């Protein structure tokens, strides 16, 4: 089952996005509907709201007066936090009940207005944010919903900022044009990314790195930050650390030539043992990262290095074993390397990035090697890796010489 999260500020067009995905075949779990359900007359939720905000948030018949509640709950951060503290846990429990009853082959669309504010974004393999600027949203609320302008602005101000939403957005859909334009963008997203993602996940099938080198893209760092947060949430205490590694972790440095890389995000999860790595297989699959069992380790080095004494200068090839997962999302190819803390391959994954960042000459040399390898490989990733290996073997020695000279440690 693929569960995606969608969100957007009030008046941005989230309801239209949700209904479009529903028409495409998605099973929509609407956070607004659940939020209303858990505060119906006679519920614990409504009783708690009355205790917190007073009897005057009720209509004469005993139902919740949502406008009266909004006036009180959105007046400041403290009041909003009280509201969220009551409603969010109740909605989460009801959501879990609904999800548990849905077929495993479904694509579940979770429509969550406060996805960012509730800290739930990292629970989803894909987050879609629909956006419109503030003035357009105010106009829609006033003209289409009859909300007073001052209330509209207060509600918008009480929600997450555009920057906070953009930070969690795997997909950013602009809705400043007509409804028809948003519908078409949503349908394109559904059929070209979401459905292929769901299929790949059902088949435990990964997306591999596209052929060719591309110039370093500033968005890689933001994408990796989201992936790291998602994987930390998925792995919990079983991950000792989660890091962005590889060439996409090397930013552009002004005044130096552009670096290049395959358009693939490499992530390293550090664990205490391979047994712990195996325990992460199912959680990572649910997060969108199936395991590729044919990849069992990295190219071993003799007299390997480590800052951990018992692994220092070891020639044991078993210390280069790992587990390997990759993303099923065609929109963001990602490799996930799970390595054991202190083992030579885990340490070199981190050292190599720091060495590249600190040495412009090394970056230039490595780029030349990658360009040659890319040309010789003609799109074959195995040949590409093999062509780089002689340089990387020497780079292993040079990187550790740099580590020794600079006092590099984890």
UniProtKB/Swiss-Prot annotation:
GO terms for cellular component: cytoplasm. HAMAP family: Dephospho_CoA_kinase. It catalyses: 3'-dephospho-CoA + ATP = ADP + CoA + H(+). This is Dephospho-CoA kinase. Its main location: cytoplasm. The C-terminal UPF0157 domain is involved in the proper folding of the full length enzyme. The lineage of its organism: Bacteria, Bacillati, Actinomycetota, Actinomycetes, Mycobacteriales. Residues 3-201 form the DPCK domain. Catalyzes the phosphorylation of the 3'-hydroxyl group of dephosphocoenzyme A to form coenzyme A. It comes from Mycobacterium leprae (strain TN).
